[in-house]
Structures are given as structure tokens and as C-alpha cells.
Amino acid sequence: CIAAGAVKLDGKTLGDIFLGKVTTWNDAAIVALNPGVKLPDSKITVVHRSDGSGTSFNFTNYLSKVNPDWKSKVGEGTAVQWPTGIGGKGNEGVAAYVKQIKGGIGYVELSYALQNKMAYTAMKNAAGKFVQPSDETFAAAANSADWGSSKDFYLVMTNAAGDNAWPITATNFILVQKKPKNPAGLKNTLEFFRWVYSKGDAQAKALDYVPLPDTLVSQIEAYWAKTLPR
């Protein structure tokens, strides 16, 4: 059994695994990234989502940025035509299959991996460093991202440039109407998220989510004041 984070992958190799081009754990491409690690001569079984999901969008967006073959043959989306593997419904379905199948590999939110005591790989990021998924590497991705109000702060954070950034970090977005039919409802919603941003860090971290950087929160609240009805 190899400990969590002991195996290293880069984006191209990860993409080749999900393309079905790298099919064993001791393939030369994986061995080259893991000198000194005894890798098993066992088949890799890819597990992906069977349902459409933001998790799949984020994962396939990342692969499209780092693996040209993936970009040209599969691309990105909440649901894609997977070249190989089996599908599981939801994060829980993917986690269950990966746990059951020897040599399985999939993608889930970190909270599911931790709750299910699953191993995970280290990944080579855009800065060329191998990093593991954690609050610190997620925060590094968020802190290095180029947020901006011109696109309502919409940003896909995959392959972020930060020195210690986890390369497959995702953001959750809240959508509200700029001209709501129920202004009181919008006001209550914004008050809730003001509380989340100012008081909710501990709850977010307990669920393995990372709070937004303070500077970004200030920008968002200024944007609310300028853009949304009071």
C-alpha cells in the first residue's frame, strides 16, 4: 500500500491515464515521475462521473489546459464522452468504485477523499512544484488568481500560477438577480453571505472548504454596493 501523496503525477500523465493511453501503475511515464517508489504492476481502472457535474467540468478543464490530446479529443464540460473507465454517480459513487477496485483512480472533492480514507496523488503544478491537496495549497491557488469584477468575479482556477497552488482547485459561485422581483429576499441573502464571509471561516474549514482571501471579500462587498439594489 502506498501512502497518500506518495505517488506523483503531472498533468500530461494524468490526462494520458484518463485517455486510456497509460494503463498500468508501473508505466514508464509514471515511473519517471517517481524515482525510488516501488510501483505495482497492476492495471489502472479509470473511474469518472456518470452524471453531469461541476467537478467534472473543473477536472476536464484542467486536463484541457495541460494535455493537448485531451483538449483535441475530449475537451471540457460538465459531461463529456469519456474515452475509458466506468462511471459513478456523484462524488460518493466515484469514491465507492475507487475504494472497491484495485488500481482504481478517480476524482472527487477532497472532503470525500478524507472521509473515505482514500489515497491521493501529489500533482505537479504550473510553477513546476509537486504539491498535495490541502487547505494551504487551495488557498495558494485562490491568492494567486486574477479575480476581477468585470466578469462578476467568475474565474476557473485550474492550473493557477501560484508557487504552492494545487492545480485542480475549484470555486463555488453564488448567483443572484441584479434586478430581483423580491428585493427583501436579496437583502436577506446578502446579509447571510456577509455573515459567512465574516464569521463562517471555521465552519468552512471543518467541511474542507477554504475561505476566500480577505482582499477578495472586500472587493466583492464593494461590488455589491455598486451593482445591486439596496
Residue ranges and their predicted role:
Residues 1-230:
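Flexible loop/hinge segments at secondary-structure junctions
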